[in-house]
Structures are given as structure tokens and as C-alpha cells.
Amino acid sequence: MTVVNKSFLTFLVFFCQILFPLNASALEAPRTVKAWASVLGDNIAETWNEPQHVDLYVPAITWHARFAYDKEKTDRYNERPWGAGIGKSRWDEKGNWHGLYVMAFKDSYNKWEPIAGYGWEATWRPLPDDAFHVGLGYTLGVTARDNWDYIPIPLVLPLASVGYGPATFQMTYIPGTYNNGNVYFAWLRLQF
């Protein structure tokens, strides 16, 4: 057996042990996933049925990471995502934000792109003024694009925000490969 084959075999055995552990925690995983899905479903239902706010979404900027694109492409792309959206949101007993939203905006090709989903952010109020807040979380949703024939595409993306009172600047990053994805997208969210 060559050194490369031995190294590969060692890696394969190690990887399989990580991927397929044979212990009690592996048997608990389905229950953990079920519990997480149950909490997610409850949070979505509570946000839909008992919202504290109606939100207005105003897309502000898209930025294609210059290190991940050919200049010819970024020169042609739209980075002004005109559009609007509406949503429902609430703050839970821990002070974290939950929101349901639907938004439409002009994508990189200046075509309309709808998106709808649920967002959650752990929220901190680091200053003595409780009106100032920052958040980190995620969004689960569905979008559709003109260049993909408006086929619904599920998504899971990170969220981050900074806000004061009812105004929040919220953002995400769409990961990708060279000349695809790697887009920063941000919007203003106003709570009423």
C-alpha cells in the first residue's frame, strides 16, 4: 500500500467515525431535530398570530464582492435594489426579534426578485439607551429569479442588524463561487 493510499484510508476511517458515530448522542439527534423544528414552527405561528408590529422593508444596497467577480460583470450589475416589502414582527420574552416578511426588489440584472420568509435575531442592547440594538441571526425563506425562470428556491442565510428604536438596518450575505453569489444585501426595516 502506498503512503497516499494509507493516508486516504486513515482519513476515510476518521471521517466515517465523525459522520456516523455509534453512541447515544447519535440516537438523540432525531429528537433534537424534531425539537428544533417544533420550536421553529411555534415561533412562526406565534409571529403570524400575535404580531406586535407591522414592518415596512425598503431595500437599500446590494454589493457584489469585487474579489469574487470579473470586473466586466460587476460593471454591468445593478447594485440599487429598488423595491419594497411588508412584514409582521414581535420581540420575545428574551428580547429577541422574530419576523415574517415578503419583499420584492430589482436584482443584479435589474429584474424583479420576490422573497418571503421568517427571520430570527438574537438581540443585544449594549448601551444604557435601550433604544439602540444590534442583532445576529438567520432567515429561512423562498426566492425566485428571472434568470432561473422564477422557479422557487429555498434559502437559509445569516442576518445581522443595527438599529435605534423602530428603525433597523438589516443585512445578509449570500455566499457563492467565483462570478456567482458573494453578494451583500441590506435593507431598512421600519416597525409600526
Swiss-Prot record:
Species name: Cronobacter turicensis (strain DSM 18703 / CCUG 55852 / LMG 23827 / z3032)
Predominant cellular place of this UniProt entry's protein: membrane
Q: Which residues form the active site?
A: 64, 107, 108
Q: Which UniProt keywords apply?
A: Acyltransferase, Cell outer membrane, Membrane, Signal, Transferase
- Establish whether keyword Disulfide bond is in the entry: no
MF term (GO), any: acyltransferase activity
Kindly list the places in or outside the cell where this protein is found, as annotated in its UniProt entry: Cell outer membrane
- From the record, what ranges are coiled-coil? none
- Known EC number: 2.3.1.251
Under catalytic activity, the entry for this protein gives: a lipid A + a 1,2-diacyl-sn-glycero-3-phosphocholine = a hepta-acyl lipid A + a 2-acyl-sn-glycero-3-phosphocholine; a lipid IVA + a 1,2-diacyl-sn-glycero-3-phosphocholine = a lipid IVB + a 2-acyl-sn-glycero-3-phosphocholine; a lipid IIA + a 1,2-diacyl-sn-glycero-3-phosphocholine = a lipid IIB + a 2-acyl-sn-glycero-3-phosphocholine
Q: What does this protein do?
A: Transfers a fatty acid residue from the sn-1 position of a phospholipid to the N-linked hydroxyfatty acid chain on the proximal unit of lipid A or its precursors.
Asked if the Swiss-Prot or TrEMBL record annotates the protein with the keyword Acyltransferase, the reply is yes
Family (UniProt)? Belongs to the lipid A palmitoyltransferase family.
Q: Which GO terms describe its cellular component?
A: cell outer membrane
- What are the residue positions of the site described as Role in lipopolysaccharide recognition? 73
- The name this protein goes by in its record: Lipid A acyltransferase PagP
Q: Name one GO biological process term.
A: lipid A biosynthetic process
Q: State whether it acts alone or in a complex, and with which partners, per the record.
A: Homodimer.
Q: Which InterPro entries match?
A: LipidA_acyl_PagP (IPR009746), OMP/PagP_b-brl (IPR011250)
Which EC class heads this enzyme's classification?
Answer: transferase
